[in-house]
């Protein structure tokens, strides 16, 4: 195989290679003969379709498929021959002839010796208590609460239906009329000063509040200004929580309505949530230590740029889903994404290097356990398991996640670590 490699940057390489034409023709010819034996075409007996007809019908497709497969095979072979370790996907362009190609790609940087025993990691521990289960049941009651109108002044926990309008200098918002809405006091949904201003208001009462909005407030006309906000309580309602009886318990999928089974199911769900939260904390701990130890290593620029683009696209999507305008993202936010992306790439490459150098292998048992854990959050877990097993992309993502967790655990076990006990609530507050 003809292939040559050259460095075009600290971490960028250019590989020029030529496809073996005879192998391509052999593959194409073999595939066409196979189609001639198996393809049914009207007017011809099975297995008797002339090669010329097969060539006319399938030749272009067969040649394209063969070219794609041979291109990847030849490139991979050249990469192995030159002992290259790619960071990201290559860009492959046509060369001077139909069989000449030029691949441009980035390689994994040299991290030198990776000694994880010098890292200091805090491993957090926590457990689910009966009090945590009681609190979750209380939260479930809050989810099913109803509202009863009252004549007294509003207090924390009440639902207040309100009308508002604001005066920012010479500008009135809205220009005419009022804005309507509702908020549960203490929920943090509204601006804190407005929520506190609503406390004590009874149905029909109004108040003018002087509010200092921060410079980054989401409404440009109010940002950084002292604004007169006029509020009126249209209605005040107090919450009515349901009793924890059989009907309530059955509504959460416990067919028997048994209270002990209900608590057992809640414990299982909380323990699953806790396990994920503790792993996220450990992942962050290990990641921060790796970043601090290897921040001096240059990262592949294109890989970082791609990661930053993915992070920006994710934020835009999240803002659209929540009804916010992506235009609110500051113009200078790009550098922030680049910095975060560089750290994410650094940790990802280091995790891969640790796995490779220490010959860590994906544990199929752990993959199955994680899949069962994911599936248990759905009403039809067996269908979810089957969906994963039949979708290579989903399964690949799951395997990557499990492999990363294996490496994180491996690093934490060998690093200098201390244990810190947390309450359940503190542990899940990542």
Curated annotation (Swiss-Prot):
Q: Name one GO biological process term.
A: protein unfolding
UniProt entry keywords in alphabetical sequence: Cell cycle, Cell division, Chaperone, Cytoplasm, Isomerase, Rotamase
One GO term in the molecular function aspect is: protein folding chaperone
| Main enzyme class | isomerase
Q: Which InterPro entries match?
A: PPIase_dom_sf, Trig_fac, Trigger_fac_C, Trigger_fac_C_sf, Trigger_fac_ribosome-bd_bac, Trigger_fac_ribosome-bd_sf, Trigger_fact/SurA_dom_sf
The EC number(s) attached to this protein equal: 5.2.1.8
The reaction(s) catalysed by this protein are: [protein]-peptidylproline (omega=180) = [protein]-peptidylproline (omega=0)
Q: Where in the cell is it found?
A: Cytoplasm
Among the Pfam families in the record, one is: Trigger_C
Q: Which GO terms describe its cellular component?
A: cytoplasm
PPIase FKBP-type domain location: 157-242
Role noted for this protein: Involved in protein export. Acts as a chaperone by maintaining the newly synthesized protein in an open conformation. Functions as a peptidyl-prolyl cis-trans isomerase.
**Which HAMAP family does UniProt cross-reference here?**
Trigger_factor_Tig (MF_00303)
Swiss-Prot/TrEMBL domain comment: Consists of 3 domains; the N-terminus binds the ribosome, the middle domain has PPIase activity, while the C-terminus has intrinsic chaperone activity on its own.
State the family it belongs to: Belongs to the FKBP-type PPIase family. Tig subfamily.
Q: What is this protein called?
A: Trigger factor
Q: What is the species listed in this Swiss-Prot or TrEMBL entry?
A: Xanthomonas campestris pv. campestris (strain ATCC 33913 / DSM 3586 / NCPPB 528 / LMG 568 / P 25)
What lineage does the source organism belong to?
Bacteria, Pseudomonadati, Pseudomonadota, Gammaproteobacteria, Lysobacterales
| Gene name of this polypeptide | tig
């Amino acid at each position: 195989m003809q292939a040559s490699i050259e460095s075009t940057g600290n971490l960028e390489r250019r590989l020029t290679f030529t496809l073996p034409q005879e192998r391509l023709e052999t593959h194409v010819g073999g595939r066409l003969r196979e189609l001639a034996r198996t393809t049914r075409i009207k007017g011809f007996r099975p297995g008797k379709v002339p090669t010329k007809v097969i060539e006319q019908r399938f030749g272009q497709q067969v040649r394209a498929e063969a070219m794609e497969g041979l291109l990847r095979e030849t490139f991979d072979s050249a990469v192995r021959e030159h002992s290259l370790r790619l960071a990201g996907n290559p860009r492959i362009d046509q060369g001077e002839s139909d069989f000449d190609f030029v691949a441009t790609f980035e390689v994994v940087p040299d991290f030198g010796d990776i000694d994880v025993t010098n890292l200091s990691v805090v491993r957090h521990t926590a457990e689910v208590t009966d009090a945590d289960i009681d609190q979750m049941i209380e939260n479930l009651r809050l989810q099913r609460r109803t509202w009863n109108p009252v004549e007294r002044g509003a207090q924390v926990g009440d639902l207040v239906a309100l009308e508002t309008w604001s005066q920012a200098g010479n500008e009135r918002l809205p220009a005419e009329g009022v804005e309507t809405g509702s908020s549960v006091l203490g929920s943090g949904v509204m601006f804190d000063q407005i929520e506190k201003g609503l406390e004590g208001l009874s149905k029909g009462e109004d108040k003018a509040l002087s509010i200092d909005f921060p410079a980054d407030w989401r409404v440009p006309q109010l940002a950084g200004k002292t604004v007169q906000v006029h509020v009126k309580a249209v209605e005040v309602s107090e919450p009515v929580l349901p009793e924890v009886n059989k009907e309530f318990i059955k509504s959460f999928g416990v067919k028997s309505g048994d209270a002990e089974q209900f608590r057992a199911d809640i414990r299982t769900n909380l323990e699953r949530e806790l396990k994920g939260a503790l792993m996220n904390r450990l992942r962050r701990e290990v990641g921060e230590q790796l970043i601090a130890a290897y921040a001096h290593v240059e990262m592949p620029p294109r890989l970082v740029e791609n990661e930053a683009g993915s992070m920006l696209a994710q934020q835009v999507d999240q803002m659209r889903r929540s009804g916010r305008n992506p235009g609110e993202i500051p113009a200078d936010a790009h550098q922030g994404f680049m910095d975060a992306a560089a750290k994410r790439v650094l940790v990802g490459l280091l995790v891969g290097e640790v796995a490779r150098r220490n010959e860590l292998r994906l544990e199929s048992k752990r993959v199955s356990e994680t899949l069962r854990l994911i599936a248990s959050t759905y009403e039809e877990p067996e269908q979810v398991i089957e969906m994963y097993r039949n979708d290579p992309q989903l399964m690949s993502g799951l395997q990557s996640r499990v492999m990363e967790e294996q490496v994180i655990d491996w690093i934490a076990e060998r690093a200098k670590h201390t244990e810190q006990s947390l309450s359940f609530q503190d542990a899940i507050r990542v």
